[in-house]
Amino acid sequence: MAMYGGQIHLIIGPMFAGKSTELIRLVKRYQIARYKCLVVKYEKDARYGNGVRTHDNTCISAVPTASLDDVESISEHVEVIGIDEGQFFPNIVSFCERMANAGKVLIVAALDGTFQRKPFTNICELIPLAENVTKLNAVCMYCYKDASFSKRLGNETEIEIIGGSDKYKSVCRKCYFF
């Protein structure tokens, strides 16, 4: 296993910040450069079929899975691995470290915090292992300033509720408390 050349690129931020768009852009750039790429998406997010699709309908083919262990064998045959909705994979830290140490480039798009502004611990643990961390902001859907947080609409308290603008709004600090 190669111990050099691999890297982890982490893209974090709230809902609607463009994390999946940036993931797709980076993977497509590697594809143009003729790298073998694999994109993985969270299996329970079935809103857009078998691809990773942005809120503005940009799409890339992806393998749906509930566990990154399930894609480890096909990961051996690629050089770049894109992971969307990284916060939903409990073993993302060990998987990314293993793959990067094997010489692979990992591009992970993930929420950094819950709708309660609590950290996704697995993503926070990935930060010191990443060569590059990009924190994106969205636009506050109430006052149109920079938005760093995701606010859930409705009264559900579970952390994992898949949805788009029907379930969440991106908000700034001030509007989070409205």
From Swiss-Prot:
Single GO MF descriptor: metal ion binding
Domain of life: Viruses
Swiss-Prot/TrEMBL catalytic activity: thymidine + ATP = dTMP + ADP + H(+)
Binding site for ATP: G13, P14, M15, F16, A17, G18, K19, S20
Residues given in the record as substrate binding sites: F115, I159, E160, I161, I162, G163
Listed Pfam families: TK
Keyword Metal-binding: yes
Keyword flag ATP-binding: yes
Keywords: ATP-binding, DNA synthesis, Kinase, Metal-binding, Nucleotide-binding, Transferase, Zinc
GO BP annotations listed: DNA biosynthetic process; thymidine metabolic process
Active site: E85
Record-linked InterPro entries: P-loop_NTPase (IPR027417), Thymidine_kinase (IPR001267), Thymidine_kinase_CS (IPR020633)
Residues annotated for Zn(2+) binding in this entry: C140, C143, C172, C175
Enzyme Commission code(s) on record: 2.7.1.21
Family per similarity comment: Belongs to the thymidine kinase family.
Full protein name: Thymidine kinase
Organism: Myxoma virus (strain Lausanne) (MYXV)
